């Protein structure tokens, strides 16, 4: 499949042939598994001190006192200790470090999931179904010249996004930023932020600095491209801006 390459003014300058990876069959099941596997590998194992709740001098007072025969503090027989239902006692079933809390995925399945997610970015119906505003986008998949990599001013990237037709989607992401319900507000994740366009480049020459302040916009190099960037929340079809160099690098990696 041939697509046009646009300059920073939104004008077509040439045509290129897309790599075969953009013809990969759509596999939402593998994409979902790969994203969840990536999530779970960020979880830190939990455990408890094996001696927690057991560092008390206790005794069993035996029967004949009109009290339950549980371990009690030696100096204060009135207070139970050590047992799970006592104040300061041990946990009944504490979390174990040995618990398997991550999900694995085979290497070939992960590779196929990334390839399928890349192909989904070129599917107009999937991009629109994901919620992106694509009415004014000049082309899907959107390929631009490598000059985009050198833009390091936020004002410049704003004008480029407007000329390429993706600014409406950034406005959507800005409007959909909401305060999170629950205690997550206190734990460093106060806002729920929508995902906007993804910019994939061959090499960062300033574009990260130029695009990072736009709501919902992510920038990543092809070599660091993962399924979480392409399908946030396990939902494939993210609106993606590819540079020409990134397309050529994809051809080298995936064919």
UniProtKB/Swiss-Prot annotation:
Domain of life: Archaea
Gene3D superfamilies: 3.40.1370.10
InterPro entries: Ribosomal_uL4 (IPR002136), Ribosomal_uL4_dom_sf (IPR023574), Ribosomal_uL4_euk/arc_CS (IPR013000), Ribosomal_uL4_euk/arch (IPR045240), Ribosomall_uL4-arc (IPR019970)
Biological-process GO terms, alphabetical: translation
Task performed by this protein: One of the primary rRNA binding proteins, this protein initially binds near the 5'-end of the 23S rRNA. It is important during the early stages of 50S assembly. It makes multiple contacts with different domains of the 23S rRNA in the assembled 50S subunit and ribosome.
Assembly: Part of the 50S ribosomal subunit.
Listed HAMAP family: Ribosomal_uL4_A (MF_01328_A)
Family: Belongs to the universal ribosomal protein uL4 family.
Name of the protein described by the UniProt record: Large ribosomal subunit protein uL4
Organism in which the protein naturally occurs: Thermococcus kodakarensis (strain ATCC BAA-918 / JCM 12380 / KOD1)
């Amino acid at each position: 499949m041939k697509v046009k390459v646009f300059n920073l003014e939104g004008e077509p300058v040439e045509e290129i042939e897309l790599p075969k990876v953009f013809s990969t069959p759509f596999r939402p099941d593998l994409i979902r598994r790969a994203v969840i596997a990536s999530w779970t590998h960020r979880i830190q194992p939990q455990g408890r001190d094996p001696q927690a709740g057991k560092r008390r001098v206790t005794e069993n007072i035996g029967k004949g006192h009109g009290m339950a025969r549980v371990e009690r503090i030696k100096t204060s027989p009135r207070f139970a200790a050590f047992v799970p239902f006592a104040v300061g006692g041990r946990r009944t079933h504490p979390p174990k470090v040995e618990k398997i809390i991550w999900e694995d995925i085979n290497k070939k399945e992960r590779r196929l999931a990334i390839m399928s997610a890349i192909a989904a970015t070129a599917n107009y119906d999937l991009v629109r179904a994901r919620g992106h505003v694509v009415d004014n986008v000049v082309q899907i998949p959107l390929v631009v010249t490598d000059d985009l990599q050198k833009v390091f001013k936020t004002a410049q990237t704003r004008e480029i996004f407007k000329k390429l037709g993706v600014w409406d989607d950034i406005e959507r992401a800005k409007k959909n930023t909401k305060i999170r319900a629950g205690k997550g507000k206190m734990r460093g994740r106060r806002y729920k932020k929508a995902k906007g366009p993804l910019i994939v480049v061959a090499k960062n020459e300033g574009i990260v600095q130029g695009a990072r302040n736009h709501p919902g916009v992510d920038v990543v190099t092809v070599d660091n491209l993962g399924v979480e960037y392409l399908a946030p929340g396990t939902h494939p079809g993210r609106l993606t801006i590819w540079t020409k160099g990134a397309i050529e690098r994809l051809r080298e990696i995936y064919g």
